[in-house]
Amino acid sequence: MSAPTGPSIDAREVARFERIAATWWDEAGPMRVLHRFNPVRLAYIRDAACRHHGRDPLGPEPLAGLTLVDIGCGGGVLSEPLARLGARVTGLDPAPTNIRVAKAHAEEAGVPVDYRPQTIESVVAAGERFDLVVAMEVVEHVADMASFVRTACAAVRPGGLFFAATINRTMRSFALAIVGAEYVLGWLPRGTHDWEKFVTPEELARAVESGGLVVADTTGVVYHPLSGRWSAARDTAVNYMITAERPAA
């Protein structure tokens, strides 16, 4: 199976993640930071979606019945818990090896996720639309951020939500997300990130608005070294997440 192509696909990035595809679910491996980050982004999506739809975020399946596409799903580290919250999840990734890993893990776990080796461009071109569109830790890895975000926004139904998480382009993010995380602490494989591809909140907001959505929230995420945990915060100098809405028709 060959990897799909498209204007947002950076072949070098796809190849980099394919090389470590077998480690997606190894919580002590190259993806360990993502696993520690997962509770924060999962809660952010759940809580915002529940506020938007008037649901109880602490209910057994708070996202029940909502369609969701996880763009750049990798091995399914976020897709699976979103499906456990009741969402009807479609996971997209341009790396076929990632999709094979994701499918195998979901089948073993008994979690229903529709994984596809596709791009968001092909899904939008086919006319599919979703209640929730998720692009977490993706926009800093695509070839054309603005084009990618506009296409992702096109997948949002009227009244739906778009979520993104990425890294701000600041000197602090260079020091922490690249020098610290990749070279000093070894949390991530060297070369995982390119500082010049980091995205400021203002740049991301402009791309979202050009796609017809309105930014509803921007929240920072900070790491606490003593506890080893991440939490939502006002500080957006390094990691941050956004929620955007498409007005109801």
From Swiss-Prot:
Pathway, per record: Cofactor biosynthesis; ubiquinone biosynthesis
Record field: catalytic activity: a 3-demethylubiquinol + S-adenosyl-L-methionine = a ubiquinol + S-adenosyl-L-homocysteine + H(+); a 3-(all-trans-polyprenyl)benzene-1,2-diol + S-adenosyl-L-methionine = a 2-methoxy-6-(all-trans-polyprenyl)phenol + S-adenosyl-L-homocysteine + H(+)
Pfam families membership: Methyltransf_23
Keywords on record: Methyltransferase, S-adenosyl-L-methionine, Transferase, Ubiquinone biosynthesis
A molecular-function term among this protein's GO annotations: 2-polyprenyl-6-hydroxyphenol methylase activity
InterPro entries reported in the protein's UniProt record: SAM-dependent_MTases_sf, UbiG_MeTrfase
A GO biological-process term: methylation
EC number: 2.1.1.222, 2.1.1.64
UniProt keyword annotation of Methyltransferase present: yes
Chain residues that bind S-adenosyl-L-methionine: R41, G72, D93, M136
Role: O-methyltransferase that catalyzes the 2 O-methylation steps in the ubiquinone biosynthetic pathway.
HAMAP family in the cross-refs: UbiG
Family designation: Belongs to the methyltransferase superfamily. UbiG/COQ3 family.
Annotated PANTHER family: METHYLTRANSFERASE, UBIQUINONE BIOSYNTHESIS O-METHYLTRANSFERASE, MITOCHONDRIAL
The protein, known as: Ubiquinone biosynthesis O-methyltransferase
Species of the source: Methylobacterium sp. (strain 4-46)
Phylogenetic lineage: Bacteria, Pseudomonadati, Pseudomonadota, Alphaproteobacteria, Hyphomicrobiales
Encoding gene, per UniProt annotation: ubiG
